[in-house]
């Protein structure tokens, strides 16, 4: 009767497997319930009235001008948007609705400086200086935050979740900021002369960059086949700018507007149920679910090309860094153990253009030896 000893473990494993399937199957329902509660609590931002399949809501939009413009839009289940433009909005449309440079915050978070075993540890102060120099060159604000100080706010969850409380704290520190640009620590700004406002945020520039009626990719296990960006998207409706690769959206580099809608999206993204589910791609998977499942989020997320804000170390012309691009992100370098190799490859390019002054003094000698070894 040896087979009897295997029955109990088999039953336990079966229960675990069935529970996992149930958890995934019911996640959408539970999130929808939480979303509805959240929307009800935030009626000052999205004042929704439900009539059959149509949602009508009034939404305050934050602009660089010191006013709040109220614009009424109609969003159906197919996310068709028909805006009603107010007289004030008509008047402001003749202006140039882009933020002043001083109202941009470049944000970076890391704990590589505290961890000698991190592959970025020998370079992290130079990476910080790379960001600070760029921000100062264009009159932007720059904030570096220590990831270790944010671990209590995320508990035992993966480190990428810390970027949400970091962004919220920066918004509290700079209440007049228009946009926050989050850029992961495994990245370098390559073109110091390319102004983020001119490159992305000016109304006419963003209008030309938005990928309208473009398919969203997903490697997250989310059924997104046939799901596309809005056909008609006004830059003034965009409160979150991000790019995607073959795995779907990549949150290594994105911009979020400091507006009621932007902060609402941060709160929504920080939903505990997302953290409990916690898929392979962590916070990116949660953001993908938000975009795919909720028309309000879908409307306010602007998809742009990867190379415009998040170029990779890749030979693919759609994703790979080319001379003149704003930045390069070493996506996946911790997994493939290529962080040091990537930094040295692109650090050498920067040095050939800018000289050696971009190194942090405390790391200069080591980096010079790595980039330009003596025989």
Swiss-Prot record:
Keywords: Endoplasmic reticulum, Glycosyltransferase, Golgi apparatus, Membrane, Signal-anchor, Transferase, Transmembrane, Transmembrane helix. It is a single-pass type II membrane protein. GO terms for cellular component: endoplasmic reticulum; endoplasmic reticulum membrane; Golgi apparatus; Golgi membrane. One of its GO terms (molecular function) is alpha-1,2-galactosyltransferase activity. This is Uncharacterized alpha-1,2-galactosyltransferase C1289.13c. It is an enzyme of class 2 (transferase). Pfam families: Glyco_transf_34 (PF05637). It is found in: Endoplasmic reticulum membrane; Golgi apparatus membrane. The chain crosses the membrane at residues 3-23. Residues 1-2 are cytoplasmic. Belongs to the glycosyltransferase 34 family. InterPro entries: Glyco_trans_34, Nucleotide-diphossugar_trans. Its EC number is 2.4.1.-. Its main location: endoplasmic reticulum. The keyword Transferase applies. Residues 24-375 are lumenal. GO terms for biological process: protein N-linked glycosylation; protein O-linked glycosylation.
């Amino acid at each position: 009767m040896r087979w009897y000893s295997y029955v109990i473990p088999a039953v336990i494993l079966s229960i675990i497997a069935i529970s996992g399937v149930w958890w995934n199957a019911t996640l959408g329902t539970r999130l929808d319930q939480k979303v509805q509660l959240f929307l009800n609590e935030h009626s000052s931002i999205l004042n929704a009235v439900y009539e059959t399949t149509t949602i009508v809501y009034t939404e305050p939009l934050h602009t660089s001008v010191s006013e709040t413009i109220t614009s009424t839009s109609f969003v159906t289940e197919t996310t068709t948007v028909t805006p009603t433009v107010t007289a004030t909005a008509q008047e402001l449309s003749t202006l140039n609705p882009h933020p002043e440079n001083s109202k941009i915050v470049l944000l970076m978070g890391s704990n590589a400086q505290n961890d000698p075993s991190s592959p970025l540890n020998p370079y992290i102060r130079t990476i910080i200086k790379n960001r600070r120099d760029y921000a100062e060159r264009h009159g932007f604000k720059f904030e570096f935050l220590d990831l270790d100080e944010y671990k209590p706010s995320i508990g035992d969850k993966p480190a990428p979740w810390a970027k949400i409380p970091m962004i919220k704290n920066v918004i509290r520190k700079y209440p007049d900021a228009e946009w926050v640009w989050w850029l992961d620590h495994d990245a370098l700004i390559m073109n110091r002369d390319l102004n983020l406002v001119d490159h992305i945020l000016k109304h006419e520039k963003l209008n030309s960059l938005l990928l309208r009626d473009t398919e969203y990719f997903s490697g997250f296990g989310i059924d997104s086949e046939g799901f596309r960006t809005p056909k008609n998207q006004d830059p003034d409706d965009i409160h979150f700018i991000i790019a995607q690769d073959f795995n779907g959206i990549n949150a290594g580099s994105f911009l979020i507007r400091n507006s009621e809608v932007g902060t609402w999206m941060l709160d929504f993204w920080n939903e505990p149920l997302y953290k409990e589910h916690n898929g392979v791609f962590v916070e990116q998977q949660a953001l993908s679910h938000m975009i795919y499942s909720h028309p309000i989020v879908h409307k306010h997320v602007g998809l742009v090309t990867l190379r415009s804000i998040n170029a990779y170390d890749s030979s693919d012309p759609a994703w790979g860094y080319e001379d003149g691009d704003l930045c390069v992100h070493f996506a996946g370098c911790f997994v493939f153990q290529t962080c040091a190799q990537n930094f040295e490859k692109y650090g050498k390019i920067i040095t050939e253009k800018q000289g050696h002054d971009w190194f942090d003094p405390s790391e200069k000698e080591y980096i010079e030896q790595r980039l330009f070894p003596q025989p």
